[in-house]
């Protein structure tokens, strides 16, 4: 797979499988459930230190139209895999559990029908035929309290109940299974160039917000050093808007992951969701440096 163009869901899954085949000492892939429309969801396990090592859990593509997110997640994986000798210290002491595209049906739909589709593709029972829920309003922690809609036709429809969307249940179950070892949760979105931490349901900050802010600042400093790309740092509510039911709030509030971040990638609105393909590699390059800071922090702190 290359990073000069965007790739569809099947291509990404095939690439994940190829990593397990080509780098068996480094990568393994597990099928962890099906999407609403029956697409296989895969979890990549990357590392060579054994199952007891601290984990960084990474996902992308929760919103279908945010194509740069899966591209960046796969770029990061490829960078570690292709240069595993260089990053031996990280890969021997930290495990990366990665799901690049956690809204498979929505993502597929953006390739075939509606480039700007955001939600899942589940049936809602809407008399208007509106489909899907916003998967990043569907998590159970303070679900539907703020910044979400009860209308199935809304782009921010929270769903009929928490975890109504099978894709989010699949991701949740993986986080819960490995929660004891997950030290960092990174979920990649676009756009706006933000590195955010909880909470999304309130303007109040977590008790340990300074720890989260410090790590985010160090990561963003490394990111910015690559191409000069500026990121804003802060809690979700205070940086963009209040929205409950997000995966990062859940990871921290229910999953017990101390360092939970939502990262909004390039750009700041010039192209928005339609980020040109010639920005995939530079976005990957700079984001990798930020993730590397996080990985070294986990290695030094927990391994």
From Swiss-Prot:
Its main location: secreted. It catalyses: Preferential release of a C-terminal lysine or arginine amino acid. Keywords: Carboxypeptidase, Hydrolase, Metal-binding, Metalloprotease, Protease, Secreted, Zinc. The keyword Zinc applies. Gene3D superfamilies: Zn peptidases. SUPFAM superfamilies: Zn-dependent exopeptidases (SSF53187). PROSITE patterns: CARBOXYPEPT_ZN_1, CARBOXYPEPT_ZN_2, PEPTIDASE_M14. The active site is at residue 264. Pfam families: Peptidase_M14. Its EC number is 3.4.17.2. One of its GO terms (biological process) is proteolysis. Binds 1 zinc ion per subunit. This is Carboxypeptidase B. InterPro entries: Peptidase_M14. Coiled coil: none annotated. Disulfide bonds: none annotated. Zn(2+) binds at residues 63, 66, 189. It is found in: Secreted. GO terms for molecular function: metallocarboxypeptidase activity; zinc ion binding.
């Amino acid at each position: 797979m290359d990073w000069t163009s965007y790739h569809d869901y099947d291509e990404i899954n095939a690439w994940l499988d190829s990593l397990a085949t080509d780098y068996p000492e480094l990568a393994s892939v597990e099928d962890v459930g099906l999407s609403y429309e029956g697409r296989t969801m895969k979890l990549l396990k990357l590392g060579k230190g054994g199952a007891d090592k601290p984990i960084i859990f990474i996902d992308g593509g929760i919103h279908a139209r945010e194509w740069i997110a899966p591209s960046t997640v796969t770029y990061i994986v490829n960078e570690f895999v292709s240069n595993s000798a260089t990053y031996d210290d990280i890969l021997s002491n930290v495990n990366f559990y990665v799901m690049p595209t956690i809204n498979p049906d929505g993502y597929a739909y953006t390739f075939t029908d509606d480039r700007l589709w955001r939600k899942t593709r589940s049936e809602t029972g809407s008399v208007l035929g509106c489909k899907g829920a916003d998967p990043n309003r569907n998590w159970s922690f303070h679900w539907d309290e703020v910044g979400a809609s009860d209308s199935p036709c809304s782009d921010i429809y929270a769903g009929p109940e928490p975890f109504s969307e099978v894709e989010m249940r699949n991701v949740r179950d993986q986080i819960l299974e490995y929660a004891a070892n997950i030290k960092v949760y990174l979920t990649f979105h676009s756009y706006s160039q933000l590195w955010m931490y909880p909470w999304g349901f309130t303007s109040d900050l977590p008790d340990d917000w300074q720890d989260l802010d410090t790590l985010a600042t160090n990561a963003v400093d490394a990111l910015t050093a690559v191409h000069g790309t500026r990121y804003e740092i802060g809690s979700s509510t205070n940086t963009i808007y209040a929205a409950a039911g997000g995966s990062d709030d859940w990871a921290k509030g229910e999953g017990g992951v101390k360092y939970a971040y939502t990262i909004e990638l390039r750009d700041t609105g010039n192209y928005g969701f339609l980020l040109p393909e010639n920005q995939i590699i530079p976005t990957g390059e700079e984001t990798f440096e930020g993730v590397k800071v996080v990985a070294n922090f986990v290695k030094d702190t927990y391994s």
